[in-house]
Structures are given as C-alpha cells and as structure tokens.
Amino acid sequence: MPELPEVETTRRGIAPHLEGQRVSRVIVRDSRLRWPIPEDLDIRLSGQRIVQVDRRAKYLLIQAEVGTLISHLGMSGNLRLVEAGLPALKHEHVDIELESGLALRYTDPRRFGAMLWSLDPHNHELLIRLGPEPLTDLFDGERLYERSRGKSIAVKPFVMDNAVVVGVGNIYATEALFAAGIDPRREAGGISRARYLKLAIEIKRILAYAIERGGTTLRDFIGGDGKPGYFQQELFVYGRGGQPCKVCGTTLREIKLGQRASVYCPKCQR
C-alpha cells in the first residue's frame, strides 16, 4: 500500500504539470472504486483550471477553481502523466486530460482507491478527524507521550493511528521503532517521555529521507513520473523477518500486531 512518502512523491511528480493547467475533459472507464467515482465528474471538472495539488495524510487534493478532487491510491493505485489519447490498458480507470496535451492517468488493479469530489475538502468526512502531519511542528514526542497515557495498546498500532499522527504506516512505523530502539509490542502507556521524544525524531527523519529517495517500491508503487522508489534498498527491518539484524546480527523476529506483520530485533529493541 502506498504510504505517506509514496503519496508525497506522487504529488511532487505531478504538481508542476497540473498546476495552472485547464482540464479539457475527464474520461472515466470504470467508476467502481472503493467508493463510486461521481457520475458527473467530467461536468464538474472540465473547463476548470487546476490551482494547486496538495496532500493531507495519504489523500491527494487536486484543487480546482471551484471544488477539489480527493484521491486515494488504495492498496495498489498510482497516478502518472501520459500523453492524452494514449490507449488505456486494463485497470487504467480514469484520465484527466489537460489543455497541455498531457493526461493524469489513474491505475488501480485492486480498485481499493478513491476519486471523490468536494466543495469543502478539509471538512470532508474522510479528512476532518485526521491528526497532525508528521513533518510539521504540530507533531512531536510530547504529543505522543500525552496521547499515550493510559493506553494499553501496543506502541506500533498506537503510532499508526491516524488520529494520533497521520501517514505513519506499517513500513515506516516498523523502521522508526527500530531506529528508536523500542520493542513494537510494548504498551504505549508504559513508554517514557524521553523515548517518545526519540521516536518522534526518528519518524520525522525516516519519512523525510524516504520522500527524498522517492518512496518505497515493494510491488505496485511507481511515482507520477513512472519511476519506482528507492527507499526499500535501505530498509533495516521491514520485510526482513528471519534475517540477521544489520546492526547486531541477531535474527529478526516477525510477529502479528494489530493484524499487520511486524518485524523487530529482540536485542536492539527493548
């Protein structure tokens, strides 16, 4: 599943080609995504100029002069730029054609993504309850410490809760907890302020570096320019269960936490 760095990589790849451009038409080949694509999307968006391409958590917000297209990549989706009129392949569900001659093409083999229309996106039901962005000053270790008090939930699903902080998905939670030396099974409420301060620093560092590296390509992700991400080449623990720890050589353990696979080092993480 594309996580925050992959979505931000997509945003950075497509924004320069969309912002300031006028939409000539929208072609919807299959509206059956997680939620149906609005039947009148072509009418609503065609003729409008795209003002800005923003991101909130893992949602891309394509802001037009009136209204915003809210897009989520789901489990296997991607948005990339192609020449308008390029014949579509299987699973290429939507083209947003621009007057420049390019088209923003949405591909989603598993159809778990979304393309929704809103006149007030930040108060949309999918966005209004989201926590702070991890790479802003609104998120820090103090927030993690305060929100964790009295929580018996394991720390890994706690930091993956979008009400606590957005965009810390399975890959980056696994890596950040390793970097901070915290066992992902520990109760969130039993972790000290000092360790949460360290964890917040590592979350910010790892997310920022993953964005710089173009995200993590495991199976389906490609950026808006059609290129894969390269952060997967530098993963310390995610997806490496049963292999030696890159720091101490101890065999990494793989467990299930909150219905997600989690890998950790029993020596480095306490």
UniProtKB/Swiss-Prot annotation:
Keyword Transmembrane: no
Cofactor note: Binds 1 zinc ion per subunit.
Pfam families named among the record's database cross-references: Fapy_DNA_glyco, H2TH, zf-FPG_IleRS
Catalytic activity: Hydrolysis of DNA containing ring-opened 7-methylguanine residues, releasing 2,6-diamino-4-hydroxy-5-(N-methyl)formamidopyrimidine; 2'-deoxyribonucleotide-(2'-deoxyribose 5'-phosphate)-2'-deoxyribonucleotide-DNA = a 3'-end 2'-deoxyribonucleotide-(2,3-dehydro-2,3-deoxyribose 5'-phosphate)-DNA + a 5'-end 5'-phospho-2'-deoxyribonucleoside-DNA + H(+)
CDD domains recorded: EcFpg-like_N (cd08966)
Annotated catalytic residues: 2 (schiff-base intermediate with dna), 3 (proton donor), 58 (proton donor), 260 (proton donor)
Assigned keywords, A-Z: DNA damage, DNA repair, DNA-binding, Glycosidase, Hydrolase, Lyase, Metal-binding, Multifunctional enzyme, Zinc, Zinc-finger
Known EC number: 3.2.2.23, 4.2.99.18
Residue ranges covered by zinc fingers (FPG-type): 236-270
Keyword Signal: no
GO terms under biological process: base-excision repair
GO molecular function, one term: class I DNA-(apurinic or apyrimidinic site) endonuclease activity
Cofactor(s) in the UniProt record: Zn(2+)
Binding annotation for DNA: 91, 110, 151
Function: Involved in base excision repair of DNA damaged by oxidation or by mutagenic agents. Acts as a DNA glycosylase that recognizes and removes damaged bases. Has a preference for oxidized purines, such as 7,8-dihydro-8-oxoguanine (8-oxoG). Has AP (apurinic/apyrimidinic) lyase activity and introduces nicks in the DNA strand. Cleaves the DNA backbone by beta-delta elimination to generate a single-strand break at the site of the removed base with both 3'- and 5'-phosphates.
Family from the record: Belongs to the FPG family.
Subunit structure, as described in the record: Monomer.
PANTHER family tied to this protein: FORMAMIDOPYRIMIDINE-DNA GLYCOSYLASE
Name under which the protein is recorded: Formamidopyrimidine-DNA glycosylase
Organism of derivation: Pseudomonas savastanoi pv. phaseolicola (strain 1448A / Race 6)
